[in-house]
From Swiss-Prot:
This is Chaperone protein dnaK1. CDD domains: ASKHA_NBD_HSP70_DnaK-like. Residues 630-688 are annotated as: Disordered. Gene3D superfamilies: 3.30.420.40, Actin, Chain A, domain 4, Substrate Binding Domain Of DNAk, Chain A, domain 1. It holds the Pfam family HSP70. PANTHER family: HEAT SHOCK PROTEIN 70KDA. The modification Phosphothreonine is found at residue 198. The gene is dnaK1. Induction: By stress conditions e.g. heat shock. The keyword Secreted does not apply.
Length: 688
């Protein structure tokens, strides 16, 4: 069985962690970073890039670079606000009302699940490289306030990425696992999770291995990106007033504004004033235009007053649902990078009355909690009990369009609830079950999760047939609905997949496409690595030829050196023509030729050492009357090594050797110290 990891699939950044030695460990990605930007892009040649590489191309390639797609996962196009649609890439509605992002580079449209799957695949591959074995399973976290469609969509993203999703875990609950795993005393904590695109607040009782969620609340459309957009609008309005140009209408300028806004937001968490300079942001008939301004922390906080109000309400609602007062909260755990903003920390102090805990890394704690949950499922932890809740009420549409609630919000899961319903008309032979989720009294004002019909009801007056409808929520928070005609025993059930999620056939198609992409990516990576190895070998060969020529002269191993030079030219030509077979053949030939040259050099030195040994024996028994050995070596180097070699040694004397190989009928002098010509393709110099 493959490895199982915990993944925090974030709006802005994602993190992967694994259990090692009973402790959660965050895994660095291939670029060496502990967080991976949740960004997917397609370069000018159609190559897919994920993470930091994709983020680097956002300004130059905004239409083919996709970020913050977590805000669209599991949602319908008509549910989006105008603010949510204001991104540099194109968002469209498909034939059933789902959200698609357009990729002009490939002339193709992707669902949010597919883009998220590419991020998950990147995280899983990096984790596999770290662990040394394939990652096949994952615990993936979602905002606590995600509805059923969004949870299903996240699970589908994991399947498309080739992962077995063992559990969908709420982010605040995951954070509480990482925070309270080793704590013995029971305490009431509030997890305040403000990420890049979502906001959650959960109240839990933690202690002695029990993690019980008392209440949860939040806003899936509120996060750090909204704070960034306040700065974007402020900058754009200033520029519009002074230059008469709305930068938000230019995709590239909008992307630069968004990056500058995020940078300014981060800086204002540490300083009270920041400079924003964007040269050549646009051009008019008068020439290029630059954006230069200053933003103070107080100005920024003034821009975000309404957002702070949206943060305040879920906290109050969670306290009310849990039946607690602020004084009952013993610890506040901050999760998400946006909680670093001073105004957010101050808001928490004002609401709860205590200083937030600084004991956890807000960027990594959720992934670490997911890894702990993976360890629980694998049996690594025996005495841990996790009791989560459903964030929103679940019910169905009854007569008159009202919502009949079967499972109220903040009900501990897993849970099963049922109720008896009947027909609204005489001789009605079928009933439609319309499942909704939300807190409004009318079904039409809530989120529609799906519809299905129960057929074959015997004719009877209205109100006589008895239809039992049961709601089952599993530990992942995913709903299954069953309708049973108690008269006939006929049953119909459905795992809710609302119109905003993918059908099974679509998921299977995307899995196949993801595998095709994986194969293409692997082949492209192999070609790049092959080219890099070949270029390094060519440079190694050229360097070695120069050193051999300088050390032994131009006549030493002349034929071998000429062959190496010819093969190097062949390899360069194959690289230029992208001839894979030619590259493979020339690479192997060049390796063999360099090996033979190295062998000849080593053989020469071995024989020269024999000469030194016999000369020493001669000196011991005969003496060195001519003092020729006292001559400086520099005098030898000034001579032509291949004409009348006289090195102060009697080469006519037999020292017991039967034969000596000839190297082009000449023997160059040996230099000291002896250089090493062992093949070492990992030397840093090989890559210069």
């Amino acid at each position: 069985m493959g490895k199982v990891v915990g993944i925090d699939l974030g709006t802005t950044n994602s993190v992967v962690a694994v259990m090692e030695g009973g402790k959660p460990v965050v895994i660095a990605n291939a670029e060496g970073m502990r967080t991976t930007p949740s960004v997917v892009g397609f370069s000018k040649d159609g190559e897919r890039v994920v993470g930091q590489m994709a983020r680097r191309q956002t300004v130059l390639n905004p239409q083919n670079t996709f970020f913050a797609v977590k805000r669209y996962i599991g949602r319908r196009y008509n549910e989006l606000s105008p603010e949510s649609k204001r991104v540099p890439y194109t968002i469209r509605k498909d034939e059933v009302g789902n959200i698609k992002v357009a990729c002009p580079r490939l002339n193709k449209e992707f669902s949010a699940e597919e883009i998220s799957a590419m991020v998950l695949k990147k995280l899983a591959d990096d984790a596999s490289a770290y662990l040394g074995s394939a990652v096949t399973g994952a615990v993936i976290t979602v905002p606590a306030y995600f509805n059923d469609s969004q949870r299903q969509a996240t699970r589908d993203a994991g399947r498309i990425a080739g992962l077995e999703v063992l559990r969908i875990l709420n982010e605040p609950t995951a954070a509480s696992l990482a925070y309270g795993l080793d704590r013995g005393d029971t305490e009431t904590i509030l997890v305040f999770d403000l990420g890049g695109g979502t906001f959650d607040v959960s109240i839990l009782e933690v202690g002695d291995g029990v993690f019980e969620v008392k209440a949860t609340s939040g806003d899936t459309q509120l996060g750090g990106n909204d704070f960034d957009k306040k700065i974007v609008d402020w900058l754009a309005e200033q520029f519009l007033e002074t230059e008469g140009v709305d930068l938000r209408r230019d995709r590239q300028a909008l992307q630069r504004l968004m990056e500058a806004a995020e940078k300014a937001k981060i800086e204002l968490s540490a300083v009270s004033i920041t400079d924003i300079n964007l040269p050549f942001i646009t051009a008019t008939e008068d020439g290029p235009k630059h954006l230069e301004t200053r933003l103070t922390r107080s100005q920024f906080e003034g821009l975000c007053v309404d957002l702070l109000g949206r943060v305040r309400n879920p906290v109050k609602r969670a306290l009310k649902d849990a039946g607690l007062r602020p004084d009952d909260i013993e610890e506040v755990v901050l999760v998400g990078g946006s909680t670093r903003m001073p105004m957010v920390k101050q808001l928490v102090r004002d609401l709860i009355g205590i200083e937030p805990s600084e004991n956890v890394n807000p960027d990594e704690v959720v992934a670490m909690g997911a890894a702990i949950q993976a360890g629980i499922l694998a049996g690594e932890f025996k005495d841990v009990l996790l009791l989560d809740v459903t964030p929103l009420s679940l019910g169905l549409e009854a007569i008159g369009g009202v919502m009949k609630k079967l499972i109220p919000r903040n009900t501990t899961i897993p849970v099963r609830r049922s109720d008896i319903f009947s027909t609204s008309e005489n001789n009605q032979n079928s009933v439609e079950i319309h499942v909704v989720q939300g807190e409004r009294e009318m079904a039409g004002d809530n989120k529609s999760l799906g519809r299905f019909k129960l057929y074959g009801i015997p004719p009877a007056p209205r109100g006589i047939p008895q239809i039992q409808v049961a709601f089952d929520i599993d530990a992942n928070g995913i709903l299954q609905v069953t309708a049973l005609d108690r008269t006939t025993g006929r049953e119909q059930s459905i795992t809710i997949q609302g119109a905003s999620t993918l059908s099974e056939s679509e998921v299977n198609r995307m899995i196949q496409e993801a595998q095709k992409y994986a194969d293409v990516d692997r082949e492209r990576k192999e070609r790049v690595e092959k080219r890099t190895r070949s270029e390094a070998l060519i440079l190694q060969g050229e360097r070695q030829l120069r050193e051999v020529a300088l050390e032994f002269g131009m006549q030493f191993a002349r034929n071998r050196r000429q062959r190496i030079d010819n093969i190097s030219r062949e390899l360069k030509e194959s690289l230029k023509e992208n001839d894979d077979r030619g590259i493979d053949q020339a690479y192997a030939d060049l390796q063999d030729a360099l090996y033979e040259l190295n062998r000849e050099v080593r053989q020469y030195y071995a024989e020269d050492e024999d000469d030194d040994l016999f000369a020493t024996i001669k000196d011991i028994f005969v003496g060195d009357k001519d003092k020729e050995r006292d001559l400086p070596r520099d005098s030898y180097r000034e001579r032509d090594a291949y004409n009348n070699r006289d090195y102060g040694r009697d080469y006519g004397r037999d020292y017991g050797r039967d034969s000596r190989p000839s190297y082009d009928n000449s023997r160059p002098p040996r230099k000291s110290p002896r250089p090493s010509y062992q093949d070492n393709w990992d030397d840093d110099d090989d890559w210069l």
